[in-house]
Amino acid sequence: MLTQFIPSEDFTVITKAALDTFFIAFAGTAFGLVLGIPLGLLSARNIMPFAPVRAFARAIVVFSRATPALVFALCFVRLYGIGVLAGLLAIGIHSIGMIGKLITDAAEEIDPGPREGVIATGAGSLQDLYTGIWSQMVPTVISISLYRLELDFRSAPILGWVGAGGIGLILRGYAGSLRYQELLGITILIVVLVVILEILSATTRHALLGKTETDLPGKPGRMTQLFLGGTTRPGKKIADWMINKSANKEASESESQISRSLTPPWTRERIKVNSIGLIFFVLLIISVLVPDIATSRIVDGSQKLPSFIARLTPNDWSWFTDRLFSDMIVTIAIGFAATGIALLFAIPFSFLAASNTAPGRFIYLISRLFMLLVRCVPELVVAVIFVAAIGPGPKTGTLALAIGMFGFITKLFADSIEEARQGIRDGVNSTGANRLQESVTGVLPQVAPSMVSHSLYLLDVAIRSSTILGIVGGGGIGFLLMSAAKRLYFETLGGIIFCIFVVVFLVEIIATWIRRKII
């Protein structure tokens, strides 16, 4: 019975595809960081004084975030051919959006005190940027980088559906030939790989930034803290090490000897930080060199880029048909409906997945594990399974997207609940309130603004994700998008991409306006 779920391909083929998927995610994340961090800093008001430069940088960040990675992959496959290169570029450019936005927010929220002290010493602009700004942002940048790597590894298998390399190519083959048992087997493999990556990411995050304490009865075990524990706050380990490199808590030498040292001592923390950095550097080199990325394809594809953009640009409005308009309405409706369904189940479930409101440790662990497993399955894969089970259509796409959004938003809600202040809860408890009354009265009012903000962000993500579900029969604009790409209707393809960008951008503007009015 279980043999039906084992892929028929050779083990080496599956292994190579899985490694290619990891290389796409890792190198793509690095590419996004290389471009996203400078763009994010240029978008910050307290760093870049020139408004035109800020506006240009923000425009690139918004475009990268508003355009789905699958759309980028579709275009790059046409430019560079089927393979890892298209997926790497798609992941990288789409990552710029999230990384750039979060870097901008982090830069604008830094403490101005250290920066003023650095400027008072007569430091130049670059010295101010590194010592006064960057040293405060390092913990946040590490958290953003690791979280983005997790997201990219979850989305990388989807890109193979349009030929962008990795294990998604095998998924597309199974779905096209109706081999759903083997498709489910590959899906389970993807979930296992994502879980492993999340564990490694959590290990790295805790090693660099430290851990947070949970509020569960009893002392959580090491694996509980590592695998299911609370969120990591921007910690002090890296920041303190950067700001005060000469500190050596474990050295036996006297303070006078340390102060006379011209180089920072090799403490355990410094060795750990440099070792992790070296490992990531080696992985980056491997991710670029091991996959079959021919330099000639990069050169040839880049030369075609201007003409390809010109072909994507519509000359008139003939592409804007009634079918396209109705499919865009369906896409928006799928996004709204999936958001509503996800929130309906996520709000109560998040209290079970938060360490300070869960009825017990066992329920907390089970809730966190379930949330992790749901979050690990890409929405497009869930849509394929639902299409096979109940048939194609918008209802199928809505249910599939709701499941994916549930795992995403529940984690954000649970993390916000764990940040609730204990004092207010103690006051409610002193009146004799039970656990439910305490959660509703002492916790929910505290986290309501965060929940509203996260819900609006969820709607933004859901609208963006709903645009690709039609590729596998989940309803919406995705079918026309894929059809235009296959038939080489480039003006129609460009028009659809433009519509997707406008809709997602408008939703983001409206959500930002609502967030500012409510919060």
Task: Enumerate the predicted regions with their spans.
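Cytoplasmic-entry segments and transmembrane alpha-helices of multi-pass inner-membrane transporters
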Residues: 39-73, 102, 349-383
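N-terminal, non-cleaved signal-anchor transmembrane helix
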Residues: 1-26, 30, 201-340, 347, ...
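Short hydrophobic, aromatic-rich alpha-helical segments embedded in or entering the lipid bilayer
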Residues: 1, 163-173, 300-308, 473-483
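Hydrophobic alpha-helical transmembrane segments of polytopic membrane proteins
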Residues: 167-204, 477-513
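Generic hydrophobic transmembrane alpha-helix motif, especially the helices
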Residues: 61-95, 371-404
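Membrane-cytosol interface at the C-terminal ends of specific transmembrane alpha-helices
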Residues: 82-148, 199, 392-443, 449-461, ...
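Hydrophobic positions within alpha-helical transmembrane segments of bacterial inner-membrane proteins
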Residues: 25, 29-37, 41, 45, ...
